[in-house]
Amino acid sequence: MKIRNSLKALKGRHRENRMVRRKGRIYIINKSNPRYKARQG
């Protein structure tokens, strides 16, 4: 999982990327290709 300050650019890397908010943190998740996972930090 990548940890980035800004997730805006990462969201556009794959069309199935979804932005979700869990426990106050923002994550990018991708079920078909998990290597795109990221967290804002």
UniProtKB/Swiss-Prot annotation:
Q: Which keywords does UniProt give here?
A: Ribonucleoprotein, Ribosomal protein
Query: Sorted alphabetically, which NCBIfam families does this protein's record hold?
Result: PRK00831.1 (NF002021), rpmJ_bact (TIGR01022)
| Gene Ontology MF terms in the entry | structural constituent of ribosome
Q: Which HAMAP family match?
A: Ribosomal_bL36
User: What gene is this protein a product of?
Assistant: rpmJ
| InterPro entries with a match to the protein in the record | Ribosomal_bL36 (IPR000473), Ribosomal_bL36_sp (IPR035977), Ribosomal_L36_bact (IPR047621)
According to its UniProt entry, one GO biological process term is:
translation
Q: Does the keyword Ribonucleoprotein apply?
A: yes
- Does the UniProt entry include the keyword Ribonucleoprotein? yes
Q: Name one GO cellular component term.
A: ribosome
The protein's name in its UniProt record? Large ribosomal subunit protein bL36
Q: Which family does it belong to?
A: Belongs to the bacterial ribosomal protein bL36 family.
